[in-house]
Curated annotation (Swiss-Prot):
It is found in: Golgi apparatus membrane. This is Cellulose synthase-like protein B4. Its EC number is 2.4.1.-. It is a multi-pass membrane protein. The lineage of its organism: Eukaryota, Viridiplantae, Streptophyta, Embryophyta, Tracheophyta. Disulfide bonds: none annotated. It comes from Arabidopsis thaliana.
Amino acid sequence: MAESSSPLPPLCERISHKSYFLRAVDLTILGLLLSLLLYRILHVNQKDTVWIVAFLCETCFTFVWLLITNIKWSPADYKTYPERLDERVHELPPVDMFVTTADPVREPPLIVVNTVLSLLAVNYPANKLACYVSDDGCSPLTYFSLKEASKFAKIWVPFCKKYNVRVRAPFMYFRNSPEAAEGSEFSKDWEMTKREYEKLSQKVEDATGSSHWLDAEDDFEAFLNTKSNDHSTIVKVVWENKGGVGDEKEVPHVVYISREKRPNHFHHYKAGAMNFLVRVSGLMTNAPYMLNVDCDMYVNEADVVRQAMCIFLQKSMDSNHCAFVQYPQDFYDSNVGELTVLQLYLGRGIAGIQGPQYAGSGCFHTRRVMYGLSLDDLGDDGSLSSIATRKYLAEESLTREFGNSKEMVKSVVDALQRKPFPQKNLKDSLETAQEMGHCHYEYQTSWGKNIGWLYDSTTEDVNTSIGIHSRGWTSSYIFPDPPAFLGCMPQGGPEVMVQQRRWATGLLEILFNKQSPLIGMFCRKIRFRQSLAYLYVFSWGLRSIPELFYCLLPAYCLLHNSALFPKGVYLGIIITLVGIHCLYTLWEFMNLGFSIQSWYVTQSFGRIKTTCSWLFSVLDVILKLLGISKTVFIVTKKTMPETKSGSGSKKSQREVDCPNQDSGKFEFDGSLYFLPGTFIVLVNLAALAGCLVGLQSRGGGGSGLAEACGCILVVILFLPFLKGMFEKGKYGIPFSTLSKAAFLAALFVVLSVGN
């Protein structure tokens, strides 16, 4: 007999974005690439090295496109209904929020403060939230800023919830004046809150330039005589919410932590900091879910926690199998759509397989999954199976895995069994928390190996992600509008190059460690297509080699007077391939509202970062594998725009927020990152000039218009370097780089013509 009542509406829905037309385009491009390879094979000449090199490069490009096609085949994401949450869930689960910072100079405390304030003010019961700030720089300035911010939070949080403010980072919210009647209650509250924020900002700025406050309070005694790489563990409760009823005026817990560091002890960078956050939060609040954000990624959507809970609390098999919920990363100071396009098309594509990769920020994790639980360890109702209970809950096993802290072991048992954690005084856990921050606490445990954030890579996020997927778990992707989190991009070419090198190096490290998808696709529970998706990401660095060669081949052939591309009717393969690919990628950008210029900048920077920054990642990994050197984690510099009231003019948020409208100019410095790009431009210019003056060698296979067009296309893609040769200051290429590149280019021309 059917029930009379209709089923309850879902908290979330999985949305498929399949497009048979886009699949056809992907397959067409793949077919053209295979046709080009077939032509190379049928017309190969053993004496023609260029032909063989071109074939090898194009084989790499074909394999990369095959991986892209696999990713984009079945895109999906989730639509959530947070307004249904209160009707469906009697009591919302607690959430621990983690913020990580490492350098008060490159990551100014005011940026950290704004991120923390935005987290404290989210639309979620304050008694269910706790914010933990990890300071790997052990900076008293960061701690001072947090103390002052916790005072301002008592004004900011009630203001946001009273008026349902969407953007809850003060520095961004106060950039525009409100449209409200003068003298109204809102207007008065707005003015008062803005004044208090300006006082907070001034205090932080004054403290940055002076240290008199350091000796004025006993609370800073722990920071005396400390260095960023040599100090004891510091754990301090900045603010404790003792109300515990979820009132709108309450402010969630705020805890400052800085783990012990010693010069002769490797600290595993951000992964080590995250694992200490997990342990301390497990002692104090032990929430079943954890959000982690970088210090510059503020909350841009107040319902962000509720949206994630819609995924976790949905009563379905998919939700029981979901290990983490990832939000896309977006930036308030960038008008270039590369990351947006990448996340929308490739991010959704991976989400349609086994789930998105963990991106290092803007991600909600399940605590017991981070404690090493596998999907096979769960019963149908999501609880531990009898075998898993014996495996995980034996005290001896837990001590060996998690360390010798009894309090930590007890919190792990509670988390694995999903027991509610009783409220307690946070300061009662301070002594144990400090012990767990010692350098030797993780020695002979599973932290960083099977538990928590995984080590052995500077990209701890993706390394941890593939470890989770290899245990059978899935993940979910939410693509909200407006973006859930916004951060700041590294400003200038050198900073971007450093970041790209770090990413590519870390990803390539994983390709050669035990988490490699080449191993996982055969002997772990990660799906085959998901392994291929990871392989696409991990091979970023390796792509630099064929791309570098392919940027030089047209110039070599023009100088050597040999053919690179097919002739006659077969040239149509190349023309059609390039034309379809350009139109396809241009459509992807314009479909999302980006301009043709944004598309060009992305295509240009794609070649620049691959041949310049990613190239050094290959060298880094080779030296590491040979034991000659170790990879180093370099913190990228964060900046924030000044807080100024707007004039009321109607501008988009990106236009208002972007602090550097001198964009479009590429910045250079004297580092080696810019040597390959300068060399490529000089070589292709020399080849074009040599063709015009008849410098080509005699008796070659005959280069032609196609090779000349190839050189022109390379110069267009590396146009920032061409402009940099005529600019001065930070926008100009240093003479030392130009002279080195010119010498290499001259050598290349001589060898090409001579051969």
